[in-house]
């Protein structure tokens, strides 16, 4: 199945095949979500069948919006598709851009809308094995320490978010 994503080609936003966008390092739209439960972050380990960064740990979920799909709608859709999570209302926290080598000759050059959703003890997480190998709740301070000690276990974008954007994304958690 060919997946088309919104990407800029010669300054014009157009629909581009997802793999082509990553091979060429085209600037493209993306959405990232962090689900928090108190001071813990719901992390996922990417499935081994993913075409880039398989097996690495990353934020709760991330994706590319469909053409004309609002970022908020995309965030809710992807929480359900990747993790079976329903009923959360992600709040927009940040808009950022980054470029990172994700291995295998692929480049992520994303313009990202970042969302945070608050969960409670009743949250049900049912990972889709085509997307997610494992999930884990990690206290924010422990996450920062783990990423610093073992950066190769985490996606490049998560490392960028924590290094350059933690205060904006996580607010008080990042300031403690």
Swiss-Prot record:
Instruction: Copy out the cofactor comment.
Output: Binds 1 Mg(2+) ion per subunit. The magnesium ion binds only when substrate is bound. Binds 1 Mn(2+) ion per subunit.
The top EC class, named as a word, is isomerase
Q: Which residues form the signal peptide?
A: none
- Gene name, please? idi
> Which terms in the Gene Ontology molecular function aspect does this entry carry?
isopentenyl-diphosphate delta-isomerase activity; metal ion binding
Question: From what organism does this protein derive?
Answer: Roseobacter denitrificans (strain ATCC 33942 / OCh 114) (Erythrobacter sp. (strain OCh 114))
Q: Where Mg(2+) is bound, by residue?
A: 82
Identify the Pfam families for this entry.
NUDIX
Q: What is its main location?
A: cytoplasm
The positions flagged as active site in the entry are 62, 110
Q: What is this protein called?
A: Isopentenyl-diphosphate Delta-isomerase
């Amino acid at each position: 199945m060919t997946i088309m994503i919104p990407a800029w080609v010669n300054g014009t936003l157009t629909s581009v095949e997802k793999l082509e966008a990553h091979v060429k390092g085209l600037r493209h739209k993306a959405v990232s979500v962090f689900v928090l439960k108190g001071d813990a972050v719901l992390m996922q380990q990417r499935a081994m069948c993913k075409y880039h960064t398989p097996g690495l740990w990353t934020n709760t979920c991330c994706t590319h919006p469909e053409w004309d799909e609002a970022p908020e709608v995309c965030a809710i859709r992807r929480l359900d598709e990747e993790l079976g999570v329903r009923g959360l209302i992600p709040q927009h926290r940040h808009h950022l851009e980054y470029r990172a080598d994700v291995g295998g000759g692929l480049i992520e050059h994303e313009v990202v809308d970042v969302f945070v959703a608050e969960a409670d003890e009743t949250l049900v997480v049912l990972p889709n094995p085509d997307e997610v190998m494992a999930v884990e709740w990690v206290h924010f301070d422990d996450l920062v320490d783990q990423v610093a000690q073992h950066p190769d276990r985490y996606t490049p974008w998560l490392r960028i978010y924590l290094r350059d954007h933690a205060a904006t994304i996580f607010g008080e958690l990042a300031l403690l």
